[in-house]
Design a protein with these regions (language model features):
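RNase H-like (RuvC/DEDD) metal-dependent nuclease/polynucleotide-processing core
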Residues: 1-4, 8-233
Length: 233
C-alpha cells in the first residue's frame, strides 16, 4: 500500500514537504521527494502541481493523496460563523468561512491555493473523500497537528520554534515508520505523520481513523465542508 502526502505551501514549491509512505500501519517505509528533484521551482500553480502529484501517484501506485490545507468553504446552512465543522472539531488555527472569507486574513492566499489544488486533483480523478469511501482513489485533507494529537504525541511546533526535528523522527520510528532521513525538514516530517492515516484507511477502512467534520458537497460554484482525517492509535 502506498500513499502520497504534501505539507502544503503556497509561496514557493521548495517549501512544500512531500513524502511517499509504503507498507502498512505499524510498518512503513518513507521516501522524501524534494521539489527540486521533481522539477518544481518558483511559485506554486495549482494546475501544474496537481498534474505532477497525479503523475507521481500513478507511477508509484499510490491510491490516496493527502494535502495539509482546506478543501472547501463553510456550508451556507452551518451554525458556525467563521469556520467549517472539521476545523472546529480539529481546533485548526486557520478558518475558512463563506467563499472568500478566511481567518486570519493573512492565510487567504494559502486557503485559495489549497482549494484550487483539491479542485484540480478532482479533475485528474482524485475526488474529495467521503464517509462512503471504499478503497478508490481519493484526495484527503490532513492536519499534522491533529495527527500528532490523535497518536498521543506532543505536536511539533512551528518551523521557527523547532531547532531540531529529531524527537519527532524518533516518534515516527516508534510508530513503525522507517527510512526517515536525518536530513528531513520540518515540513517533510509533517507530511510523513499526516500520511499515516492513509495507510490506516487502506488497511482498515474509514471507521478506523480519526475523522473530524462531515462529507464535502458541491453548492453552486463552490465545494463546502469536508473531512479532516488523522491516524488513530
Amino acid at each position: 500500500m502506498t500513499v502520497l502526502s504534501v505539507d502544503l505551501a503556497s509561496r514557493r514549491y521548495r517549501d512544500n514537504g512531500i513524502a511517499l509512505l509504503r507498507g502498512r500501519w505499524g510498518h512503513a517505509r518513507c521516501e522524501i521527494l524534494s521539489a527540486d528533484a521533481l522539477g518544481l521551482d518558483g511559485e506554486p500553480d495549482a494546475q501544474t502541481f496537481a498534474a505532477l502529484l497525479h503523475d507521481v501517484a500513478v507511477r508509484e501506485g499510490a491510491r490516496l493523496i493527502l494535502l495539509d490545507g482546506p478543501q472547501g468553504w463553510r456550508a451556507e446552512q452551518s451554525a458556525l460563523v467563521h469556520q467549517r465543522r472539521c476545523e472546529r472539531e480539529s481546533l485548526a488555527p486557520g478558518k475558512t468561512g463563506l467563499p472568500g472569507v478566511v481567518k486570519p486574513a493573512t492565510w487567504t492566499r494559502m486557503a485559495l491555493f489549497s482549494i484550487a489544488l483539491f479542485d484540480a486533483l478532482h479533475a485528474h480523478g482524485w475526488p474529495r473523500i467521503t464517509a462512503a469511501w471504499n478503497g478508490e482513489r481519493a484526495a484527503i485533507e490532513s492536519f499534522p497537528t491533529q495527527a500528532w494529537r490523535s497518536l498521543g504525541v506532543p505536536a511539533m511546533p512551528g518551523r521557527a520554534s523547532t531547532p531540531s526535528v529529531d524527537p519527532w523522527r524518533a516518534h515516527l520510528a516508534a510508530l513503525g515508520v522507517h527510512d526517515v532521513p536525518s536530513t528531513v525538514t520540518h515540513d517533510e516530517v509533517q507530511a510523513v505523520v499526516a500520511a499515516l492515516v492513509g495507510l490506516q484507511l487502506l488497511g482498515a477502512g474509514f471507521s478506523a481513523v480519526d475523522a473530524r467534520g462531515c462529507d464535502p458537497h458541491r453548492d453552486g460554484e463552490h465545494w463546502r465542508e469536508g473531512w479532516i482525517l488523522s491516524p488513530r492509535r
